[in-house]
Amino acid sequence: MAVEGGMKCVKFLLYVLLLVFCACAVGLIAVGVGTHLVLNQTITHGATPSFLLPVVIIAVGAFLFLVAFVGCCGACKENYCLMITFAIFLSLIMLVEVAAAIAGYVFRDKVRSEFNKDFRQQMKNYPKDNQTASILDKMQKDFECCGAANYTDWEKILAVTNKVPDSCCVNITHNCGINFVVKDIHTEGCVEKIAAWLRKNVLVVAAAALGIAFVEILGIVLACCLVKSIRSGYEVM
């Protein structure tokens, strides 16, 4: 009876952890999508570290949600194979998370370098591509920045002194970027502003990853306890 009561407690805790996994999965997907959308606006498409990291975060979130579903089915039916699968998949997710964290740290300077290079390239396309102009204008509005390093970058692009896009203005009005006064525009560059935003979100992801890792370890332990109990039941039968 004591063993049966203990297993009921293990199953209850496992159900709680599975709900936490679902919440974490949704959070990872949201952060991954948000980061990807920001990078997608400025960095050239391709299989670069800049694009792969958000994709990995999204994939881990989606896989974690699937694993939580498998764990829920296994715990509910007390199915030995499903619980073993759950424990193995959870271990694989932890390995992927560690690999992603290492890759993010190793390629952090490369991401910034690519971001700066591609942002400047899109600035060159600003006068001749309306879609690019719209994207850069939105970024400059949202991040309250101007140019790549600072507002003077636009003088080289627009080939006109004392002129920046209207999206650089603190209070945006038509042609406010012509013959501007410095105090009336955002002077900081977008590369540093967006890099700061990414660093902030990386810290959030890192903190969340530590919490998720602890929950995953606990989930593996509880799954193993339930597997042992199920196997003991088979042996008795």
Swiss-Prot record:
Residues 1-11, 73-81, 224-237 are cytoplasmic. CDD domains: CD63_LEL (cd03166). InterPro entries: CD63_LEL, Tetraspanin/Peripherin, Tetraspanin_animals, Tetraspanin_CS, Tetraspanin_EC2_sf. Residues 33-51, 103-202 are extracellular. Palmitoylated at a low, basal level in unstimulated platelets. The level of palmitoylation increases when platelets are activated by thrombin (in vitro). A motif (Lysosomal targeting motif) lies at residues 233-237. GO terms for biological process: cell migration; cell-matrix adhesion; endosome to melanosome transport; pigment granule maturation; positive regulation of integrin-mediated signaling pathway; positive regulation of receptor internalization; protein transport; regulation of vascular endothelial growth factor signaling pathway. It is a multi-pass membrane protein. GO terms for cellular component: cell surface; extracellular region; late endosome membrane; lysosomal membrane; melanosome; multivesicular body membrane; multivesicular body, internal vesicle; plasma membrane. Keywords: Cell membrane, Endosome, Glycoprotein, Lipoprotein, Lysosome, Membrane, Palmitate, Protein transport, Secreted, Transmembrane, Transmembrane helix, Transport. Glycans are attached at N40, N130, N150, N171. The chain crosses the membrane at residues 12-32, 52-72, 82-102, 203-223. Its main location: membrane. It is found in: Cell membrane; Lysosome membrane; Late endosome membrane; Endosome, Multivesicular body. Functions as a cell surface receptor for TIMP1 and plays a role in the activation of cellular signaling cascades. Plays a role in the activation of ITGB1 and integrin signaling, leading to the activation of AKT, FAK/PTK2 and MAP kinases. Promotes cell survival, reorganization of the actin cytoskeleton, cell adhesion, spreading and migration, via its role in the activation of AKT and FAK/PTK2. Plays a role in VEGFA signaling via its role in regulating the internalization of KDR/VEGFR2. Belongs to the tetraspanin (TM4SF) family. Interacts with TIMP1 and ITGB1 and recruits TIMP1 to ITGB1. Interacts with CD9. Identified in a complex with CD9 and ITGB3. Interacts with PMEL. Interacts with KDR/VEGFR2; identified in a complex with ITGB1 and KDR/VEGFR2 and is required to recruit KDR to ITGB1 complexes. Interacts with SYT7. This is CD63 antigen. It comes from Bos taurus (Bovine).
